[in-house]
A protein has these predicted regions:
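Short, flexible, mixed-charge acidic loops at enzyme active sites
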Residues: 71-85, 137-146
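A short acidic, glycine/proline-enriched capping/turn motif at secondary-structure boundaries
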Residues: 61-64, 79, 132-134
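A gly/proline- and charged-residue-enriched helix-loop-helix capping module
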Residues: 77-114
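Active-site loop segments of alpha/beta catalytic cores
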Residues: 1-20, 53, 99-323
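Glycine-rich, N-terminal phosphate-binding loop and its surrounding beta-alpha-beta segment
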Residues: 43-71
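Glycine-rich loop at the start of a catalytic domain that most often binds anionic cofactors/ligands
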Residues: 22-26, 64-76
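Active-site-flanking structural segment that lines cofactor/substrate pockets
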Residues: 23-51
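Active-site nucleophile and cofactor-binding loops and adjacent substrate-binding regions
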Residues: 33-34, 59, 221
Length: 323
């Protein structure tokens, strides 16, 4: 990553499932969250039908927690909800470290294999891996972990010593399975502030990223500018920014040390605006120097396929005019 290219790639490092693509692939949530074939079919649709230049899976952040034994709510009566973790553990002394081939992580691994069979070696596969601090929040509960960083730092570090290994083990196994890019997704780390990020998120993200023999991306929701320097310090190959972040400011903060991924607003622009609005936003971001054109967060299930395809068309138009 961060090397000269003929055209800026158009991908998503966050979730890509939409209702239109579910219909087209005959692969619907919630089944596609936990069935390898349906997961692969839906993930592939964002590439083969919508035109994104990579295949990205899964569609939620529950693979690691579910494989550890946490209860997951799949919202069985809804096909527009991503799953949520609803319970953790009564004790944190001997947390399980599941094999990447077990449980929902194993399902994701199987889906990766199916995707690779379908696209060959020419199309990148991106897999989202839950970041260590976010996984700690799944295990402990988000409200509790936010209190613990103040009142019980030893407990937080004890949990993180397990979660970073789970994230890293899973990511490493995915790379061996044929995944090209690992996207560490750390939404919970966005709400702890720079000081706590430095103490609790940064050290474990660094260890996880250093263990991966493939390009890595770190996505953190919200205004990540106050922690941008530390995001670079994690050692990832690319930083994915939320739509709330100025691409110009982020590029200035990164100073060429890694790639900048982003950051089309997935709702206000990608879902709600027409082709012209999407085109204008994409061209603005390309002119501001993003390395990879992508949504600033997970694609809304209500996004039309034509709007996703408009990202690629806008990129092509931008580079045609530069020749």
């Amino acid at each position: 990553m961060n090397k000269p290219v003929d055209k800026t790639p158009v991908v998503s490092v966050t979730q890509t499932g939409t209702l239109e693509l579910m219909n087209a692939a005959n692969a619907y949530w919630p089944a596609a969250h936990r069935d390898a074939k349906l997961m692969a079919d839906l993930a592939l649709a964002a590439h083969t039908i919508a035109g994104l230049e990579a295949v990205r899976l899964p569609f939620g952040l529950t693979g690691e927690a579910a494989s550890m034994g946490c209860r997951v709510n799949y919202h069985e009566d809804k096909n527009d909800f991503t799953p949520t973790v609803e319970c953790g553990f009564p004790s944190y002394d001997n947390l399980p470290v599941p094999s990447p081939n077990e449980g929902l992580m194993g399902t994701i691994m199987d889906a990766v294999g199916l995707c690779r069979e379908r696209v060959g070696c020419d199309v990148p596969i991106i897999v989202g891996v839950t970041g260590p601090f976010t996984l700690a929040g799944h295990i402990r509960g988000v409200n509790d972990i936010l209190t613990d960083v103040i009142l019980d730092p030893d407990l937080v570090n004890k949990i993180l010593e397990t979660t970073w290994r789970i994230s890293a083990n899973f990511a490493g196994a995915l790379v061996k399975k044929g995944v090209d890019v690992i996207a560490f997704i750390e939404p919970t780390a966005s709400i702890i502030g720079p000081d706590f990020f430095k103490a609790y998120a940064l050290p474990y993200l660094k260890k996880a990223a250093a263990s991966i023999r493939a390009p890595t991306v770190l996505h953190i929701c919200g205004d990540s500018l106050p922690i941008m320097e530390m995001m670079v310090e994690t050692g990832v190959s690319g930083i994915s920014i939320d739509q709330k972040v100025s691409a110009i400011a982020a590029k200035s903060a990164i100073r060429g040390r890694c790639s900048l991924v982003g950051n089309i607003d997935p709702v206000a622009v990608l879902q709600m605006k027409g082709d012209q609005g999407v085109e204008e936003e994409c061209i603005r971001l390309l002119s501001e120097g993003v390395s990879v054109l992508a949504p600033g967060c997970g694609i809304s299930p209500y996004t039309r396929t034509s709007q996703i395809a408009a990202m690629v068309k806008a990129r092509d138009k931008y580079f045609e005019h530069r020749i």
